[in-house]
């Protein structure tokens, strides 16, 4: 752990920042702290397509098409992640590499902050906190990495790492710049900033009044600035949050049954936060640091009320972002609370436990990627099908494509446009859910040269950066035509289904298996909701048909050539070598399309 440095020899100087620190166990300190970052870089590279989910895809499309920074609600930290990919746009890189740079740029920035505090400031505890801020409480939100508080908290840690040192007053300007970035990152950053300064304040280590005065003036100025120029989104959220006449969500807090729901949610998804909170309370009480105990516990429970007076807890990307402030509230006191020197064995155990937590959280992020990988695969399947129909603007029925992992949210049209542009601007397509097309009469008020950017926002096609995107002028076409399948039985012998199953599955599991359906006839298979067209399957063993739990998966798009999609399959309890057959059901009748795949069930 880093030592709390309070000697004149440790003042911040440029020469000191360039000098390599001499830690104990130098080889370990040169390698181990970087391992989590290597994993984060690898994940960001491998999952770059998935990291344009929701707001992330919105900002990417904005800076690519506007060819400049896109900042909303004065949250200027948003520009940090846009610097590197925007340079790529300016020099004309392919969009694949722009998306890759965008994914990596988030990790690059936090890694630079880590290097600055860990080596430049010799503060290993702050470096460890920055790693924790990139892993704890994050799974779904790894795919919306631009969330402003994910920037505000590491900057807050950097601010505190400098603040704890002795420094000449002119260094305050660096802190004030950091303070502005922190406070303008997110409204909740104001709460976290006050929390940290209150937690830090002690008579023994208090700084001269002029330091607090400078920080306080900037804080008041930031509050006034936000008050007068607050965007509609923020003002609307705050007005609703504290209007307890219209917002009655807080009433759930007087229902004893809700605390069971809240407790189970916290235990399942935030157990490390609860454990850290208990350790902090015990540590502060044992040291009789009652003011700090009041600050930590008061902030924790005040934020519990704030969250639950606006939301009902549930696992989601948005809820992860709402819950994120609990991470700095408990881990900043915990990590800084460990003594800088003492029994080496205890310090080693502490470092080992924190390292295990980081490794565990990295594993959670990796295994949580499965639904996002499937989601991207489904988008690419729909893009392929859309291209076969001709045109570039499509709608899809959410009733037939929702596979659970689909997450058919407002950014779906944006994400499909970005993903399709990887193959070339001339074959770009955008696919919107049907609900978006009919939202507030979009289908009637939209011109032929417009497209759905978000369900509540239409864009002219001339707005697009022609280097990367081109959409044809014309109406939206459906991927799920409602034309009746009158002659479908006559084309069954000209259809094939290829099953891309794994070779081994566990008995009684339920899995998604990719299949490719090939229609070699001139008659399409129409997948409209009311056409009752499904993919289903049955199992055989030595040519004997097994009893099985039939699951029907709606055909996600019309088939006029080749169409790929996933089918949900229940693995039977029988173990051994089995055969899986997939077929199409139309009005409860099997078409008898040939398909067969050998599978080992264990």
Language-model-detected regions and their locations in the chain:
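Start-transfer (signal-anchor) and selected internal transmembrane alpha helices
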Residues: 1-41, 337, 341-342, 579
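Transmembrane catalytic cores of multi-pass membrane glycosyltransferases
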Residues: 40-106, 111, 139-149, 180-281, ...
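Transmembrane-helix motifs of polytopic, lipid-linked glycan transferases
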Residues: 104-124
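Transmembrane-helix signature of polytopic, membrane-embedded enzymes
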Residues: 117-137
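Membrane-interface transmembrane helices that cradle and orient dolichyl/undecaprenyl
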Residues: 156-172
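Signature aromatic-anchored transmembrane alpha helix within multi-pass, membrane-resident enzymes
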Residues: 288-300, 337-362
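Hydrophobic/aromatic-rich transmembrane helices and adjacent perimembrane loops
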Residues: 311-342
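Membrane-embedded, lumen/periplasm-facing catalytic core of multi-pass transferases
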Residues: 354-428, 434, 452, 491
């Amino acid at each position: 752990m880093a030592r709390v440095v309070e000697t004149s020899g440790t003042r911040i100087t440029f020469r000191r920042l360039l000098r390599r620190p001499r830690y104990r166990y130098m080889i370990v300190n040169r390698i181990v702290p970087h391992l989590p970052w290597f994993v984060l870089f690898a994940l960001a590279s491998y999952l770059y397509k998935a990291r344009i989910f929701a707001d992330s895809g919105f900002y990417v499309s904005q800076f690519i098409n506007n060819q400049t920074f896109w900042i909303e609600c004065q949250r200027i930290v948003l520009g940090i992640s846009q610097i590197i990919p925007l340079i790529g746009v300016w020099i004309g890189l392919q969009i694949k590499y722009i998306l890759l740079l965008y994914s990596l740029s988030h990790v690059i920035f936090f890694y630079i902050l880590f290097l600055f505090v860990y080596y430049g400031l010799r503060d290993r505890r702050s470096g460890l906190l920055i790693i924790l801020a990139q892993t704890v409480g994050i799974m779904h939100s790894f795919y919306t990495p631009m969330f402003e508080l994910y920037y505000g908290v590491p900057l807050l840690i950097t601010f505190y790492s400098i603040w704890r040192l002795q420094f000449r007053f002119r260094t305050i300007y660096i802190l004030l710049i950091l303070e502005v970035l922190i406070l303008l990152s997110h409204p909740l950053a104001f709460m976290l900033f006050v929390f940290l300064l209150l937690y830090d304040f002690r008579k023994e280590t208090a700084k001269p009044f002029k330091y607090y005065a400078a920080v306080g003036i900037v804080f008041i100025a930031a509050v006034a600035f936000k008050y007068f120029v607050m965007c509609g989104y923020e003002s609307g959220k705050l007005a609703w949050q504290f209007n307890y006449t219209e917002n009655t969500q807080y009433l759930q807090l007087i229902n004893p049954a809700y605390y069971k729901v809240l407790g189970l949610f916290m235990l399942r998804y935030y157990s490390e936060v609860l454990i850290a909170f208990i350790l902090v309370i015990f540590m502060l009480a044992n040291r009789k640091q009652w003011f700090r105990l009041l600050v930590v516990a008061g902030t924790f429970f005040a934020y519990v009320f704030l969250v639950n007076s606006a939301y009902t807890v549930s696992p989601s990307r948005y809820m992860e972002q709402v819950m994120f402030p609990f991470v700095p509230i408990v881990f900043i006191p915990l990590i800084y609370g460990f003594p800088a020197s003492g029994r080496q064995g205890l310090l080693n155990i502490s470092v080992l436990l924190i390292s295990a937590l980081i490794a565990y959280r990295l594993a959670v992020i990796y295994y949580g990627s499965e639904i996002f990988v499937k989601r991207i695969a489904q988008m690419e399947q729909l893009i392929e099908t859309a291209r076969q129909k001709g045109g570039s603007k499509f709608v899809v029925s959410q009733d037939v494509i929702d596979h659970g992992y689909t997450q058919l949210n407002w950014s779906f049209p944006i994400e499909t446009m970005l993903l399709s542009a990887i193959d070339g601007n001339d074959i770009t397509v955008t696919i919107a859910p049907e609900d978006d097309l009919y939202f507030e009469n979009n289908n009637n008020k939209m011109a032929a040269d417009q497209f759905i950017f978000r369900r509540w926002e239409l864009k002219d096609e001339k707005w697009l950066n022609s280097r990367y995107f081109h959409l044809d002028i014309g109406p939206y076409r459906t991927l799920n035509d409602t034309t009746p399948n009158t002659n479908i039985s006559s084309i069954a012998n000209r259809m094939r289904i290829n099953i891309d199953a794994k070779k081994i599955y566990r008995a009684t599991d339920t899995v998604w298996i990719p299949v490719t359906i090939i229609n070699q006839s001139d008659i399409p298979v129409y997948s409209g909701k009311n056409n009752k067209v499904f993919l289903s399957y049955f199992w055989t063993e030595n040519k004997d048909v097994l009893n099985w739990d039939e699951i029907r998966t709606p055909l996600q798009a019309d088939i006029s050539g080749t169409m790929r999609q996933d089918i949900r399959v229940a693995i039977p309890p029988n173990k051994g070598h089995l055969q899986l057959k997939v077929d199409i059901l139309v009005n409860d009748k099997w078409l008898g399309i040939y398909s067969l795949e050998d599978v080992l069930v264990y």
